[in-house]
Amino acid sequence: MPELWLYLGRQTGRREFFLPGRSHLWQIARKKVNRARMQIFYSGRVQGVGFRYTAKSVATGFEVTGTVRNLPDGRVELVAEGAKDELKAFSQGILESGLEHFIQKEDVSWGEAKNEFRGFEIVR
């Protein structure tokens, strides 16, 4: 798998190669600058229509981490972290996935990333 090897060359011409482990790659991802946290509460007919599954599927196309879960009051809560532009595109991707017909209201709030997620998961 040569595509996984990282090149650590210097201007001196000396080349070093290494195969990073998962923890190393995760540390690199967590150090990205301009990371933000987006929390969205979706209202409408958003439970029982595959909303969480679709949100997780859409998340695979973006560099975001987070969770999506049903709330007892009938809403769905989505919390995601990543670059702000990526988060905006992700939320737009959710709307364009066919879920916009079920959403009556979308309450979005922004904050600083807490780096508490690994991947994107459905919370049950």
Located regions from the model:
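Intrinsically disordered, low-complexity, mixed-charge
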Residues: 4-124
